[in-house]
Structure formats: structure tokens, C-alpha cells
Amino acid sequence: MKEKLEAALSETKLQEYKLTEENGQLSIYAKGVPAHASTPTVGVNAAGVTFACLEKAGFEDDFVKFYNTHIGTSCDGAGIGLKFADEYGDLTLCNGIIKTENGVVSCTIDIRVPVTLKADEVRKMCADRLEDENGRMEILEIGDPLFFPRESPLVNALYKAYTDVTGDTENKPMVIGGGTYAKSLKNIIAFGPEKPGIDYRIHSADEFILVSGMEEAVLVYMEAIKNLLAI
């Protein structure tokens, strides 16, 4: 078992793993690759990879089989019936924490929903899901999307500030799956300094921004404030 698991783990993209056997018990340490919950495909989920390797190594366990069938290493929610996409992007699923308490195994999952899929529709998609397999889905929190159409005066004002300062007219305004404090107020847009072609290692070790990028962002923000005041 240990040798087969070692072989399976060696073929993965885990940053690090270690198997320790003591008193007849096998402990597994696995280190994945962190990523923002809205872009889980960029990272490597240590739990998902480990469960997949356990099954590949011949470990028989009801939960491992259940997890691999319904969640696994996929990030599209298809295994639990939540796969969805619209013109603005795909639904993403990111498993965060798995724990055992009082004989019950639970997974805390972060799902980022495309803007056209409403909260009530998500609730219907989750209702009674998995109960015929001794499982249950519970929505702990669900928020309304923050969205402004491309022709919105707010979007136009911010985009003009960006193009006037940077000269970049090739890259257009886009939506992201990240949650922001802009949701706390009405008529607010999250407007950040991330530029195409640079991996800022967001929510990972060594997250950074270039000094030149920060200086340019200040100029963009100055123009943005002037444009917003003119609306």
C-alpha cells in the first residue's frame, strides 16, 4: 500500500509530500500549490490529489470514493451537479477544508458563480443533492453578484482613465470571480492595478506588485477620480 501510494504521489504536481508509518498507521503530509479561490485551476489542491492517489493505490474507503466521484480534482462542480457557464465565465469550485467531527466528514467548499446565475437558482441546484448517497449539501452563505454592464458610465469612466494613462486599448474591461468590499456599498466598482501578462502570485507566497506598476496605478486612479466626478 505505502509503495503504491508513494508511486502515485510521485506522479503528481504537489510541491511536497511525505509518508510516515508508525504503529501500523500511515500518515500523509501533502503540500499543494496555493491559488485564489476564484481561479482554482491555477493551483494544486493537496486534498483532492491525495484522495485520488489513495484510490489509485487501492485504498478502499467510502468517503474517499465519494469525494473522488463528486469533487475530486475537478474545479467545475460537475460532480455535484453545479456545472454552469455564461458569457462572462464558468462556475468554479474550490475545496478548502476537510474535517471529521463526531463521525461526520465535512468539506467546506468555495463556489464562485457566474453573474447570470441567481442565488435562488443556486439554492434549487443544491436542494436535496447527494442525499440518496448519505450526503448533504448546505449553503452557509451566498451573496448577490456585483456587476455593471460594459456601457455603464462607471465602467466607461474607469476604462478611459486606464487607456489614457497606459495607452493600452487592446485589453478590455472584464469580470472576475473574486469577492470585494465593493459589494458593501451601492454603485461601487472594484478597480485594481493588476495588468495582463504578469503573474502577481495573488494569495500565494511572494505576492508582489512592481514599483513601476504602483506608480502607474496612482496616475490611473487620479484620472479615474476626475472622470467619476464629471459623471
Describe every region a protein language model picked out.
Residues 1-48, 208-210, 216:
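Fold-level recognition of mixed alpha/beta catalytic cores in primary-metabolism enzymes, strongest
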